[in-house]
Amino acid sequence: MAEQIAGSQARSNKWGGVFASLPAFDLAPTRTALVIVDLQYLDAHRDYGMGAEAKRRGTEEKYDYYFSRIENVVVPNIQKLQQLCRQRGIEVIFMRIASLVKDCRDVSAVHKRLRLFAPSGSKEAEILEEIKPIENELVITKGCSGAFNGSNLDQILANLGIKTLMFAGVVTNYCVETSVRDAGDRDYDVILIDDGCAAFTPQQHRFALEILNDCYCKVMTTDEVIAFIETAIEAQPRTPLATTR
């Protein structure tokens, strides 16, 4: 199993000549979670939040690549991953940017400066309809970029017995990258899903993945992740059927 995830990597850390590569790891479905970062109306929809502000300023063309990638690549791939994870008993966890109070005074200084305001209960705080949580799935609020720094995610994962995290979402080189680094520093096994993330430009996305891969995480495509999960399921020992005498 460990050899499979190592062998599936066409990408490698270009600094590997000095630093040791990230060791291969196994995946246990009951100890794994798909973490979807900030795919909400605030920053992932053309008509709300950041998208609406870009239209107001007449700069919407600057973000066309970003929103197109979310619509045509990221959302369809996350839908596939959600379906598989739900079938296989893998936790699906949503991180969202939101404030606890209506005036947003509780969010970080960076988010205040960037005007990333999404009061709880607002449309901007909602997860995109196409990938919305189903009953009993966790939606965790954060008030800054990092999933760990801005919430009690670490404690929740410990309570769930989670060891492996599969990250998808936006923005690749901002909230996603921060969360991946923090997860690595907390000794989680981390997979970053290449075609489950989006940045404002292809270059920003690619550079973030090059920096993170084989150091803080293993970068994989959706199809690679699906194959990895299915192989892990197949490798699980099966309980023998009870026999009657």
Whereabouts are the PLM-identified features?
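A structural signal for short, well-ordered beta-strand segments and their strand-loop junctions
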Residues: 93-95
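Short catalytic/ligand-binding loop motif for oxyanion handling, primarily in non-cytosolic enzymes
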Residues: 44, 101-104
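Short hydrophobic beta-strand that contains or immediately precedes a catalytic carboxylate
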Residues: 35-37
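Surface-exposed cleft-lining segments at the edges of enzyme active sites
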Residues: 43, 64-70, 165-166
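Conserved alpha-helical elements of sugar-nucleotide-dependent glycosyltransferases
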Residues: 74-77
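A solvent-exposed, charged loop/short amphipathic helix patch at secondary-structure junctions
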Residues: 47-67
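Active-site-adjacent betaalpha module
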Residues: 1-33, 47-54, 80-88, 99-100, ...
